[in-house]
């Protein structure tokens, strides 16, 4: 079952895809969005859903460190509702606390990307990979 992992921000959505067996997650792309113009990148997501035969979405929930929800959590949930309405596919949520920090560390320490501008281009994709991979591992443990 192929899933699409999404790291929803205010200006971009990082996108990752699982392999067909749902074991690993790979980065795919970063989609620019503009909430003020009601531009949510759904055309790009439709293209990806069709190309990869996606069967569901995993969105990160950027909770505060104390576990409480803020504006960013609401943004992710609203985005999830848009996806449900548009694609009629299941939407799952995964706690994403510190995934961007972890993604930044991976890019610097493991991939050797020290240029901040270069990291910024792929940080959302890497965060989406971490969200999706964490979800895949958590659901595999439950089964």
UniProtKB/Swiss-Prot annotation:
EC top class, as a word: hydrolase
Transmembrane segments: none
Gene Ontology CC entries for this record: cytosol
GO MF annotations in UniProt: nuclease activity
Main localization (coarse): cytoplasm
UniProt-annotated location(s): Cytoplasm
Pfam family membership, one: RuvX
GO-annotated biological processes: rRNA 5'-end processing
Keywords: Cytoplasm, Hydrolase, Nuclease, Ribosome biogenesis
EC number in record: 3.1.-.-
Entry similarity comment: Belongs to the YqgF nuclease family.
Role: Could be a nuclease involved in processing of the 5'-end of pre-16S rRNA.
NCBIfam families xrefs: RNAse_H_YqgF (TIGR00250)
Protein name according to UniProt: Putative pre-16S rRNA nuclease
Native source species: Lactobacillus johnsonii (strain CNCM I-12250 / La1 / NCC 533)
Lineage of the species this protein comes from: Bacteria, Bacillati, Bacillota, Bacilli, Lactobacillales
